[in-house]
Amino acid sequence: MGSDLLWLILAIVVGTYVVLFGFLRRANEWYYSMKLGDKSRYLPPGDMGWPIIGNMIPYFKGFRSGEPESFIFDLFEKYGRKGIYRNHIFGSPSIIVLAPEACRQVFLDDDNFKMGYPESTNKLTFRGSFNTASKEGQRRIRKLATSPIRGHKAIAIYIDNIEDIVVKSMNEWASKDKPIEFLSEMRKATFKVIANIFLGSSSESVIGSVEQYYVDYANGLISPLAINLPGFAFHKAMKARDMLGEILEPILRERRSMKEKDQLKGKRGLVDLLMEVEDENGEKLEDVDIVDMLIAFLSAGHESSAHIATWAIIHLHRHPEMLQKARKEQEEIVKKRPASQQGFSIEDFKQMEYIAQVIDETLRITNLSSSSFREAEADVNLQGYIIPKGWKVLLYNRGVHRNPENYPNPKEFDPSRWDNRANRPGYFIPFGGGPRICPGADLAKLEMSIFIHYFLLNYRLEPLNPECPTEYLPVPRPSDQCLARIVKLK
């Protein structure tokens, strides 16, 4: 009798677990199916995951296990290779897009799609009124604010500043009698560059203060859930964001005062331009909006340059024949310089054809930003599927760049794959695409090129752990920050 009762209790427990598990596992699907009604029949294939957390566990599991593509290849296996899938990720019902033509369509459709960052990013970055301005007003402000960093002519004025910081930083690294964390030092150097360009300041105290809080801020940008409680990365990031505002707002007041007293004397930064920009009603941006933009620019500007330049140098040193080819190109560029030319020039930058391929291949294989984010402002038809109004769209860079159908042997570092490669919209999207493509792409590539140029000409990387594993969160990086000796070439 006792044994029968035990089995009955066990059966009830197991049965209850199975029923509850099955119900909870399908709850999101049922909820959105009822909410959308007949439209749900036209959603792409996929899985809405668990209530609240959606599919964040398998998404981050791949990154933590060192196989970030596993999430996407699991979608391929379950739902076919169409490249458009429904999902629930970063707290929102979403459509994941990794078909190049579909990516191109979304990027170009600025009328039906707006920026659609996760809630954590929005709360950390956009605290002012810029996001509530009209779409036309946003376009105008964005165009005016980013004009100083678009195109070769505009970015040429920053070369001397970048070159000075690069040369001094590398001399300092090579002079140390112990190994350095190469990536960490690159981040410090690129932060100096971006702070100088955007804030118009080379003050070590200002740069140090901003960088101190920036790290915690950046770690919370893609928090799975925006939980503002002690112990969560998002909470720490919110506190860091508050401190960044407290540091930057006095800089705005100081720059405004310097302008009124005519004390800038050519030392203008992007911050000065932002203080002059007016919206469609003739209203100037509030300080909180300017701080929002400065933090966004600082984030995008220094992270991409530091990591991609570091990875490019690492990959080249892992492939001696590529390193030799890249170094020879830099030596030939120096030989061709006019006798009157001192230092790097925009013409040198234009001649760096192989380094441009190295940078593009590093962008492709590294995927510093895994996704571009949009939000549908109306029901949109995308290759026969519906994207419901209000749903997020993740244009999954990593899924495009690591798909063997788009790039044969995608895990191999091979700059030659860019030889005479035709421009195929939607296939290469490290900076996004369409009207909202990253405005700092030109400046970032210039900065990376100058770092790589001077490093290859004068230094050699000697990693202490050549087989060091890669960590993928929050961004791909060597787990030891590329602990290495920087050796000056004779």
Swiss-Prot record:
EC number per UniProt: 1.14.14.-
Chain positions recorded as heme binding sites: 438
Ranges in coiled-coil conformation: none
Any one Gene Ontology cellular component term annotated for this protein: endoplasmic reticulum
Keywords, sorted A to Z: Heme, Iron, Membrane, Metal-binding, Oxidoreductase, Transmembrane, Transmembrane helix
Ranges annotated as spanning the membrane: 4-24
Topology relative to the membrane: Single-pass membrane protein
Alphabetized GO MF terms: ent-kaurenoic acid monooxygenase activity; heme binding; iron ion binding
Record PROSITE patterns: CYTOCHROME_P450
GO biological process, one term: brassinosteroid biosynthetic process
Expressing tissues: Mainly expressed in petioles and, to a lower extent, in roots.
InterPro entries: Cyt_P450, Cyt_P450_CS, Cyt_P450_E_grp-I, Cyt_P450_sf
Subcellular location: Membrane
Catalytic activity reported: (21S)-21-acetoxyl-apo-melianone + reduced [NADPH--hemoprotein reductase] + O2 = (21S)-21-acetyl-1-hydroxy-apo-melianone + oxidized [NADPH--hemoprotein reductase] + H2O + H(+)
Gene3D superfamilies in alphabetical order: Cytochrome P450
Pathway(s) of this molecule: Secondary metabolite biosynthesis; terpenoid biosynthesis
Named cofactor requirement(s): heme
Family classification: Belongs to the cytochrome P450 family.
Protein role: Monooxygenase involved in the biosynthesis of limonoids triterpene natural products such as azadirachtin, an antifeedant widely used as bioinsecticide, and possessing many medicinal applications including anti-tumoral, anti-malarial, anti-rheumatic, antibacterial, anti-inflammatory, anti-pyretic and diuretic effects. Catalyzes the conversion of (21S)-21-acetoxyl-apo-melianone to (21S)-21-acetyl-1-hydroxy-apo-melianone.
Protein's recorded name: (21S)-21-acetyl-1-hydroxy-apo-melianone synthase CYP88A164
Native species: Melia azedarach (Chinaberry tree)
